[in-house]
Amino acid sequence: MIFSSYQGRRLLRALAVSTVLIGGIGGATAAMAPAASAATCSDVDVVVARGTFEPGTLGIIVGDPQFSALQSALPGKTLSSYPVNYPADLGEPTSVQTGNRDLVNHVTTQAAACPSQRFILVGYSQGANVVDNSIGISSDGALVGGAIVATIPTSLTSRIAAILQFGNPIRAQGKSITGTFQARTDDFCADQDPVCQANGNNVLAHLSYGGNTAAAATFAAARV
């Protein structure tokens, strides 16, 4: 079934409650997550846009385990991380645009400060919309999507080593990342996840992406 905007928001609220409960149960693990830092010139800066209401340094469902998996997959590289500064909220109508602007500003500023640094962009759920917009793929009309307000400059596209997307809402519209970044993108949509699959009917599938982070890290490592 295809969700209306209202139904989709109710779904995400239910998922948010589940995510918070998982965060409480797995609090010890979340506390061990890497501290977010992008101040120094690491070889690779991992920029993460978390999901709606997702707790954790980078996000307990995807961001934190993804950063750890990337560290394991890139033992010869130094890595830093940056959590996109945005509400990740259903009650804020410009949440995605705020994240879109912050992600682009961060990459632009960081690239100027660290000329040899490369970037891996990670987006989960609403955060995937943030990443989509930032590379010029509009999430407007998708669940918790919005219009593009900023894009990564074309002069920096070669610095984007990989894009890792999880539960990307534009996929429920039949859209995907195409063009310049297509070959550098690994886009995971769990079977029956209603956020990214128009006929999906398993809300818990949207919480399953921690199991894909090792494969995503291998994909990204081959492109750094």
What are the language-model segments listed below?
Residues 100-182, 195:
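Serine-dependent carboxylesterase/thioesterase catalytic core
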Residues 185-186:
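Short amphipathic
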